């Protein structure tokens, strides 16, 4: 996680260090969004995989799985948009490191794609 104390400002002689509050806020918000979307994708993928490993009754599966897959698709698209948005923005000249979050997001997107490909009619889900 990112903390204000992580910012190292070089103060010139006699000048107080200044922090660009908006950059810190932007980074913090972006970091939170990445963590949230990774968690949501992980949870939804686990729920979908649960139906594949331990099938419920046909009625439960027929009523729950389609809406769960639709929600997973929506979250996957949201994650992809967020990924593209973050890559396109200039975070800061302070070189904030979010590579670990990108790696986690990429792993969850791959896992989600693999999960969606297990189901028939996958062309409708991909």
UniProtKB/Swiss-Prot annotation:
Gene Ontology biological process terms, A to Z: invasive growth in response to glucose limitation; negative regulation of amyloid fibril formation; signal transduction
The protein's location, in the record's own words, is: Cytoplasm
Q: Which UniProt keywords apply?
A: Cytoplasm, Transducer
Upregulating conditions: By heat.
UniProt key word DNA-binding:
no
Q: Does the keyword Lipid biosynthesis apply?
A: no
Task: Offer a single GO CC term for the protein.
Answer: cytoplasm
The job of this chain, per UniProt, is described as:
Gamma subunit of a guanine nucleotide-binding protein (G protein). G proteins are involved as modulators or transducers in various transmembrane signaling systems. The beta and gamma chains are required for the GTPase activity, for replacement of GDP by GTP, and for G protein-effector interaction. Involved in the determination of the cAMP level according to nutritional conditions, most probably as a regulator of cAMP phosphodiesterase. Required for the control of pseudohyphal and haploid invasive growth.
Query: What subunit structure does UniProt give?
Result: G proteins are composed of 3 units, alpha, beta and gamma. GPG1 interacts with the beta subunits GBP1 and GPB2.
Tell me the protein's name.
Heterotrimeric G protein gamma subunit GPG1
